[in-house]
From Swiss-Prot:
Cofactor: NAD(+); NADP(+)
Protein name: Uncharacterized protein y4nG
Keyword NAD recorded: yes
Swiss-Prot/TrEMBL keywords: NAD, Plasmid
Pfam families listed in its UniProt record: Epimerase (PF01370)
InterPro entries, sorted: Epimerase_deHydtase, Lipid_A_modif_metabolic_enz, NAD(P)-bd_dom_sf
Domain of life: Bacteria
Family in the record: Belongs to the NAD(P)-dependent epimerase/dehydratase family.
Function: Putative nucleotide sugar epimerase/dehydrogenase.
Originating species: Sinorhizobium fredii (strain NBRC 101917 / NGR234)
């Protein structure tokens, strides 16, 4: 048993079993040395220190978010199938799946804020998992958050809920129109959160990021970097003059944390403040790499059809969303987040692309050890590996 400042006794499983007596405000050193959860200390401090559950906290973004929370003095519990790739005295790991209601309930014990990041991403391609994890898993943790009385629930959604927008910039009032299963499942998660807010009063913030870049990011972007590093030609669709916005993982983490500190339901679109066209961005990384890669334009329609066919046959790592958006303009109006959250992105498209490429070059030898996260691991190029050589047939 652990007593908080108010004198009420709170049971802390391993603490009671291990010490067999009531403890008065144990020190952080005691918590580190014992097998007691760090959350026991937070309970006994009368909830002065905030506690956060980060689902998917061992994934690419979840791990960066956890680190930023820890730097701000928050106690963090990571709920994931894989352990995080770092340690910290105020970090706790709980292994489990978002589809296990009992495990989710256990993960929420003693938590103030939830950052829900677990998702099957477009690279996964397993349509059943899009729905069971992105939708069913979100329903479970939302239900249990309501039952537990969570202070704030932050849901990391996706710009994929908008599909290929008819006009830009996209605002929070733009009607969602997902074009493939990943976007539909993420939108379903948003609806679950809104319904819990309306029905049960759950305080929810929905954060929709643009495509994420930053140190440690692999996935599809690693294919681009491999081609650039080898001096191979790089494709753009329809000239590459589509304005395309990214967001740095650190800027996204800052936005999520800021959203967790604002009371009341809100939705925020998050992206870079400075960005240009896809062609301009590729020229930046090619110039930085100094490897002689050239940009070659290929037609959008036939390329998208071929890409979707290769994906359907399991011959390409790209999903439908990749081929849909690569040649289309997509960028957010971030003024709402700037006004309400004080959101001030530090990275432009060019800066984050160069940083991500530099990280890739510095860590090539250890790539492939990213654990279970698809964004922390390289992907197999499959049939896509032939594309740069086919581009040699195009003049320019």
């Amino acid at each position: 048993m652990v007593k908080n400042f108010l004198g009420s006794s709170v049971t802390s499983g391993s603490a009671g079993a291990e010490h067999g007596k009531t403890l008065q405000i144990p020190t952080l050193r005691w918590v580190r040395q014992s097998k007691t959860s760090i959350m026991a200390l937070v309970i006994c401090l009368g909830r002065i220190v905030k506690t956060a559950l980060v689902t998917g906290g061992s994934g690419y973004f979840g791990e960066l978010l956890s680190k930023q929370l820890l730097r701000q003095g928050t106690y963090v519990r990571v709920f994931d199938l894989n352990p995080p790739g770092f340690s910290h005295p105020n970090l706790e790991f709980l292994k489990g799946t978002i589809l296990d209601r009992n495990a989710v309930r256990q993960a929420l014990s003693g938590i103030d804020k939830v950052f829900h990041n677990v998702a099957q991403v477009p690279l996964a391609k397993e349509k059943d998992l899009f729905w069971s994890v992105n939708c069913g898993g979100t329903q479970i943790i939302v239900d249990e958050s309501v039952a537990t009385g969570i202070e704030k629930f932050v849901y990391t959604s996706s710009s994929a809920v908008f599909g290929a927008p008819k006009s830009n910039p996209v605002t929070e009032e733009t009607e969602p129109n997902p074009a493939e299963d990943y976007g539909r499942a993420k939108l379903a998660g948003e609806i679950i959160c809104k319904e819990a807010m309306q029905r049960d009063g759950l305080d929810v913030a929905i954060v929709r990021p643009r495509t994420v870049l930053g140190y440690g990011r692999q996935g599809v972007v690693q294919i681009l970097f491999d081609w650039v590093e080898r001096g191979l030609d790089i494709p753009v669709l329809g000239g590459g003059n589509n304005k395309y916005q990214f967001v740095h993982s650190d800027d996204l983490a800052s936005a999520c944390i800021a959203a967790s500190n604002v009371k009341g339901f809100a939705t925020y679109n998050i992206g870079a403040a400075e960005f240009g066209t896809m062609r301009e961005l590729l020229q930046v990384v090619i110039k930085h790499a100094e490897t002689g890669s050239r940009i070659k334009s290929i037609p959008m329609g036939p390329t998208a059809l071929a890409a979707n066919l290769a994906s359907a046959l399991g011959l390409s790592p790209l999903g439908p969303y990749h081929s849909l958006m690569y040649g289309r303009a997509m960028y957010f109006d971030i003024s709402k987040a700037q006004k309400e959250l004080g959101y001030a992105p530090r990275y432009s498209n060019s800066q984050m692309m160069i940083e991500t490429y530099n990280w890739y070059q510095a860590n090539r030898a250890s790539l492939g050890k990213g654990g279970g996260s698809r964004h922390k691991a390289p992907v197999k190029q499959q049939l896509l590996a032939l594309l740069p050589y086919a581009l040699r047939l195009i003049p320019g």
